[in-house]
Regions:
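A structural-propensity feature for long, helix-poor, extended segments
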Residues: 69-79, 86, 304-329, 333, ...
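Short helix-coil transition sites and intra-membrane helix breaks within transmembrane domains
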Residues: 32-42, 79-90, 122-126, 270-283, ...
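N-terminal alpha-helical transmembrane segments of multi-pass membrane transport
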Residues: 1-61, 102-111, 116, 120-129, ...
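Membrane-interface alpha-helices at helix entry/exit sites of multi-pass transporters
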Residues: 57-61, 98-115, 294-307, 335-338, ...
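Re-entrant/interfacial helical elements at transmembrane boundaries that shape
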Residues: 41-51, 78-98, 129, 172-173, ...
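Helix-loop-helix hairpins and the membrane-proximal interhelical loops
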Residues: 1-57, 135-139, 193-304, 389, ...
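Transmembrane alpha-helix interface/packing and boundary motifs in multi-pass membrane proteins
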Residues: 27-41, 70-82, 157-162, 264-276, ...
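Membrane-embedded alpha-helical modules
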Residues: 110-227, 346-498
């Protein structure tokens, strides 16, 4: 399919009223999920678990509609409550929360919304320009190159897993081991399947694994804490100044356009490198702004609006840019992208060269859906912030059972099997212990999703190429060098981000807790 033809097809799909409603509905769910800390990824998992039964075009629009606004509404708890809405909004607290205490919450939120919109739009446009070029490049690759890229992708994600490299590698190995259970695709024989458990012949269900590893542990955390996220302020106090100064904040974004540009560029560059993403970019951009902006060393941490603009410009750009390696190479950069990769596989798409050659119209549908969702989300936040902000005060007694019921229904309907529910409980307990003891969960999901893909490329490679040919192919050598450079640079960025977070947390007294009440810092890619 030609590029112009794909653009027209993508626009034609988006022009359908059902698709527009899907984007709008996804945006509303995304805004609500982002406004409540720890529920962004579970919310996406719930929606995606239900969307796989829809028409693929509608399902993609719904998922992308939800993906974009999450990175905007997670600013609400960061600014109003001093609690990070997600891993990518931690640095926003440092100046956003002091602004709220000074009666400038609306100004901080207005700046954050526009900065996030700019970042999301720029990254979406970048996808539109990069994917046609990527199609030409990946078509010169063969099985050895994709095998190497897949292995390197898993390794990079594991290496930068919150400083726990060994745990990350072990988690990725567990994920690939789980993916190996079932029927051998080459021989057609059972593999690691007890005779008494024929359920496992089809392998472990992706939806079950994702819900059990990510979604249920977060809901269990809310239930065990047995309180709303915000306990030190009332809803009335939190939203009192939420509508004041929004337009002033947006004007400040335009005044600091060079800061926005630098932050967006940094966000995009971080986004296209697997494994770091949202867990790093907010601290890097905040530290960069603090070091380069005039007077920032003295004013950051006291309510300087530039300290809100910098990380918010970058996080949405990073989230969208992470779709580039996910769609072009089939290598997810973090937890969110691993879920999206699994989602595309369940819809019958195969991210990678085949996807770019056969489904370029879907690529442009993704681009247009992201653009529309960013606009929808920003407009709704500008006028409905006070309603979304109240979500953070919902009691777990009300919220958790509802989400839990939806998750269980989604798990059961995936195959209409009670075995799925039983296995879900086992995986959820395992996921809860990973969360509790600080084991990174994204590498496990990425290993699980990439396991069958790597196995397929490995089989083809061993049949068609000798070990020496695999290593000495020019394309392979280039990929190995680039992958090693990315791994080194990713680890370096992760260390710098950790150092920046520690330095800023100890040198800037914001009066807020450094840690989220959830495990937001653990999850990357959001």
């Amino acid at each position: 399919m030609g590029i112009l033809e794909a653009v027209v097809a993508g626009l034609s799909d988006l022009a359908s009223p059902v698709v527009i409603l899907a984007v709008l509905g996804g945006s509303i769910v995304g805004l609500a999920s982002g406004a409540l800390p720890a529920t962004g990824l579970p919310g996406i998992i719930v929606l995606i678990s239900l969307a796989v039964y829809m028409d693929p075009v509608v399902a993609v629009a719904l998922a992308m509609g939800m993906a974009a606004p999450v990175q905007s509404s997670d600013t609400l708890p960061s600014v109003l409550l001093g609690v990070p809405g997600s891993v990518s909004s931690q640095a926003t607290i440092i100046d956003g929360y002091p602004m709220a205490r000074q009666g400038r919450a609306g100004e901080a939120l207005g700046a954050a919304y526009l900065a996030s919109l700019i970042g999301g739009v720029v990254a979406a446009v970048l996808i539109a320009f990069v994917m046609p070029v990527a199609r030409s490049i990946v078509n010169i690759f063969a099985s050895p190159e994709f095998l190497i890229m897949g292995i390197m992708g898993v390794v990079v994600v594991a290496v930068v897993s919150g400083g726990a490299m060994l745990k990350g590698l072990l988690a990725a190995t567990v994920g690939m081991a789980l993916a190996a259970v079932g029927t051998d695709p080459g021989l057609g024989l059972p593999r690691f399947v007890p005779d008494s458990v024929p359920y496992l012949l089809e392998g472990f269900n992706l939806i079950i694994v994702v819900i059990g590893i990510f979604a249920l542990p977060e809901i269990m955390g809310l239930i065990i804490e047995n309180r709303s996220i915000a306990t030190d302020v009332t809803p009335e106090e939190a939203i009192r100044d939420i509508n004041e100064g929004r337009w002033l904040g947006m004007r400040e974004v335009m005044k600091n356009k060079f800061l926005v540009f630098r932050s967006v560029v940094l966000g995009v560059l971080v986004g296209i490198m697997p494994g770091i993403g949202g867990s790093v970019v907010d601290w890097l951009t905040y530290a960069q702004a603090r070091a380069t902006e005039k007077g920032a060393a003295e004013s950051f941490g006291t309510g300087d609006i530039r300290g809100v603009i910098a990380p918010e410009s970058a996080n949405n750009a990073t989230s969208a840019a992470q779709l580039i390696p996910t769609l072009a190479l089939g290598i997810p950069g973090g937890a969110y992208q691993a879920v999206y990769l699994g989602f595309f596989l369940l819809l019958g798409f195969q991210p990678g060269p085949r996807f770019l050659n056969d489904n370029m119209d879907v690529v442009f549908l993704i681009v247009f859906s992201l653009l529309l969702a960013n606009v929808f989300g920003t407009v709704m936040l500008l006028f409905l912030s006070k309603y979304f902000a109240r979500i953070a005060f919902i009691s777990p007694h009300v919220l958790s059972p509802v989400i839990l019921a939806i998750l269980l229904v989604a798990a059961f309907t995936s195959k209409n099997s009670y075995w799925d529910l039983g296995f879900l409980m086992i995986v959820a307990v395992f996921g809860w212990h990973m969360k509790r003891y600080g084991w990174p969960r994204p590498p496990l999901i990425i290993g699980f999703v990439l396991g069958p893909i790597l196995e397929r490329f490995l089989s083809r490679t061993l049949v068609l190429y000798s070990p020496l040919e695999i290593v000495l192919r020019p394309q392979s050598m280039i990929i190995i060098v680039v992958a090693l450079a990315i791994a080194f640079y990713s680890a370096k960025l992760a260390r710098e981000s950790k150092q920046a977070a520690h330095t800023l947390a100890t040198s800037v007294d914001t009066g807020v807790a450094e840690d989220s009440p959830t495990s937001a810092r653990e999850e990357s890619g959001g």
